């Protein structure tokens, strides 16, 4: 649950940072740039914490997609940017994509408790893909006969 909170904080920080960038470019104030630097940095830190348990593709899609949606809404309200029918169609498509990516995520049935949080070894990956256990798999190429 905490990792989803990290993702939410990453999204909020990205939105604030990006809107601050626009504010700084419109107003010329240095404060906007300072806020932008801190928020974008914080966003990446929070995102890196979130992807420890949230699938990277899902986390990135939500982080970027939700950010784009909210930034677009605030850009229209605060900065007078226009929202053409084509942009609206793009945003609707984006929402559909986010929903598909999120709904396509499922948890593994049984975690690999024997290896903890470390990534699988090369041998474990070979076993998973070939179904052979250590010492049983025959490497492709030459077969050696016993002399």
Curated annotation (Swiss-Prot):
The chain crosses the membrane at residues 1-21, 31-51, 54-74, 81-101. It is found in: Cell inner membrane. The keyword Transport applies. Residues 105-147 are annotated as: Disordered. It is a multi-pass membrane protein. Pfam families: Multi_Drug_Res (PF00893). GO terms for biological process: choline transport; glycine betaine transport; spermidine transmembrane transport. It comes from the Bacteria. GO terms for molecular function: amino-acid betaine transmembrane transporter activity; antiporter activity; choline transmembrane transporter activity; spermidine transmembrane transporter activity. The keyword Cytoplasm does not apply. Keywords: Cell inner membrane, Cell membrane, Membrane, Transmembrane, Transmembrane helix, Transport. Its main location: membrane. One of its GO terms (cellular component) is plasma membrane. Forms a complex with MdtI. Catalyzes the excretion of spermidine. Belongs to the drug/metabolite transporter (DMT) superfamily. Small multidrug resistance (SMR) (TC 2.A.7.1) family. MdtJ subfamily. This is Spermidine export protein MdtJ. It comes from Yersinia pestis. The gene is mdtJ.
């Amino acid at each position: 649950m905490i990792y989803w909170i990290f993702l939410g904080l990453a999204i909020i920080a990205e939105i604030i940072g990006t809107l601050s960038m626009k504010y700084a470019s419109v107003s010329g104030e240095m404060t906007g740039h300072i806020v932008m630097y801190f928020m974008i940095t914080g966003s990446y830190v929070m995102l890196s914490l979130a992807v420890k348990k949230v699938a990277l593709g899902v986390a990135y899609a939500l982080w970027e997609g939700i950010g784009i949606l909210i930034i677009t809404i605030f850009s229209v309200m605060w900065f007078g940017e226009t929202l053409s029918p084509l942009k609206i169609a793009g945003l609707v498509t984006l929402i559909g994509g986010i929903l598909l990516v999120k709904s396509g995520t499922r948890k593994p049935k049984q975690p690999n408790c024997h290896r903890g949080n470390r990534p699988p070894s090369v041998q474990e990956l070979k076993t998973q893909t070939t179904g052979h256990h250590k010492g049983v798999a025959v490497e492709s190429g030459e077969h050696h006969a016993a002399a």
